[in-house]
Amino acid sequence: KIFDEAVEAALLPYQELIWKLTEKTKELYPKKEYPQTIVIDTETTGLDPFRDELLQVSIIDEDGNVLFDSYFKPLKHKEWSKAESVNHISPKMVADAPYINEKAAELYAILSQAHWIIGYNVDFDLRFLMGSDIITDEEYNAFRTEDVMIQFAEIYGEYSVYHEDYKWQKLTTAAAYYDYDWNVKGIEAHNSLADCFATLFVYHKILSEE
């Protein structure tokens, strides 16, 4: 912990510079129209949006067209073994990937035009985007979201007495419930782009049952 705090302190001046440059690139990014309804998913080095970092962000529209998909090289983390065991993204895989700030303007252009954001535990994804200075607190709170995980939890019906609510289920469970074929897109499960397609599929299935 002491080592981590020392590293963060040493990086702070550079992080502030990166943040200023990121804000400037947002202003200068060419204007382009993006869909108002999007599906988003992320992969990260851990669960803390203000200490961990993004490894991949993927965004598709409601018709399944890919709007954004990129891996990222973390600025602070050199390894993330626990997260890697789940998302299968190794340090070697992202060694030559861009840093998040290099894609910040493009990401922001898509998010700033979105009126409706669909995701599986979408709050997790948006908090990481906020923690990476892609969106502000105000923008985060203003987004209209559709959390497929919450919707599916009630459909699946596994009730938690402790939480007095329906238990959240993994995306793989939701996909299996609706017989989703992960191979249809030829992308490995837990890749954030694959998760976007699976989330959209489950979302459409839920809508068709209403």
What are these regions (language model features)?
Residues 10-137, 142, 165-180, 184, ...:
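Conserved non-catalytic scaffold segment of RNase H-like nuclease domains
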Residues 204-210:
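Short, hydrophobic alpha-helical segments
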Residues 146-166:
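Short alpha-helix plus adjacent loop in nuclease-associated cores
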Residues 158-159, 181-184, 209:
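Substrate-binding/catalytic groove segments of enzymes
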Residues 191-202:
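Acidic, divalent-metal-coordinating active-site segment for phosphoryl/phosphodiester hydrolysis
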